[in-house]
A protein has these predicted regions:
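P-loop NTP-binding module
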Residues: 1-278
Length: 278
């Protein structure tokens, strides 16, 4: 059993209930989370149109090399954990699309690992699409998922008033999954996230596909100003802490920047790679 799964399982084994945070600083959750199984959902036209521009899809082994789960590995604990995270968010949002900020407590806590796999889990569902946005300008990673790491991204969108949003959204080799990299960073202006252009971007990304779930790969919560701004732009926040490394003071300090109404919970992560058996 992976450390991620253990952390989630410790919070409660009651059938249909998933608690992410076994910590005193977390907000208690009482809403029942019921798995969405066996539903017959008509494929939206927007998803059908997306299917024509997927690029070359990656195999399960190729995704493994990139640290991404694959739905074929149905018996692997990590796959089930991310499915449960996805189900919790879908239940919380009452089936509507949502913007989820994934924020590590500090650098090296595995936030990008959680963010990309949460996005992949949404894309597992044939009635959903996912978009991963790299908002961690000091330590970007999403460009590694793209067919060409030099493709334009978020910084290019802010710097170039002529660039269209569609030019920064790229396939990553997974059906129904797209990504926006950090882009070419000449500097890291503090005003990027507070600009109206950022808010308009998030609104546009949300409205473009009503079945799209947007995952923001956020900066560490030690960058409290950016974390607070991005949390205000998001519907929900998922905090990531590396088990045995993040201190209670760090976790509580990070949580102070987040509204209790938006906090989904904390994932305790201690696996740099997906721990399935070979």
């Amino acid at each position: 059993m992976s450390k991620i799964e253990k952390a989630l399982k410790r919070a409660g084994d009651e059938r249909g209930n998933l608690q992410l945070v076994p910590a005193a600083a977390a907000v208690e959750r009482t809403a029942p989370w019921t798995a969405l199984l066996g539903q017959q959902i008509e494929l939206p036209e927007t998803i059908s149109r997306m299917g024509g521009n997927e690029g070359t899809l990656l195999s399960a082994d190729e995704l493994w090399e990139r640290g991404i789960i694959h739905p074929q590995h149905t018996e692997e604990p990590a796959v089930q954990v991310f499915r449960e995270l996805r189900t919790k968010i879908i239940q919380q949002s009452q089936g509507q699309n949502a913007v989820i900020l994934v924020a590590p407590v500090s650098k090296g806590n595995g936030g990008s690992f959680i963010a990309r796999n949460l996005g992949a889990a949404f894309a597992f569902d044939s009635a959903k699409t996912a978009l991963l946005v790299d908002c961690n300008f000091k330590n970007p990673s999403v460009h590694r998922l793209l067919p060409d790491a030099s493709l334009p991204g978020l910084a290019d969108y802010f710097e170039n008033p002529e660039i269209d949003i569609s030019k920064i959204i790229h396939p990553v080799g997974i059906a129904r999954f797209r990504a926006i990299s950090a882009g070419e960073l000449r500097e890291i202006p503090a005003e990027y996230f507070v600009s109206m252009k950022m808010r308009r971007l998030i609104d546009s990304l949300r409205e473009r596909y009503h079945e799209r779930f947007i995952v923001l790969d956020g900066p560490p919560m030690s960058d409290i100003a950016d974390a607070r701004i991005l949390s205000e732009l998001s519907d929900y926040v998922l905090v990531v802490a590396r088990h045995g490394r993040a201190t209670n003071a760090q976790i509580e300090g990070g949580l102070s920047a987040i509204s209790n109404k938006k906090l989904l919970g904390i994932v305790f992560n201690d696996e740099p790679r997906i721990p399935w058996r070979r």
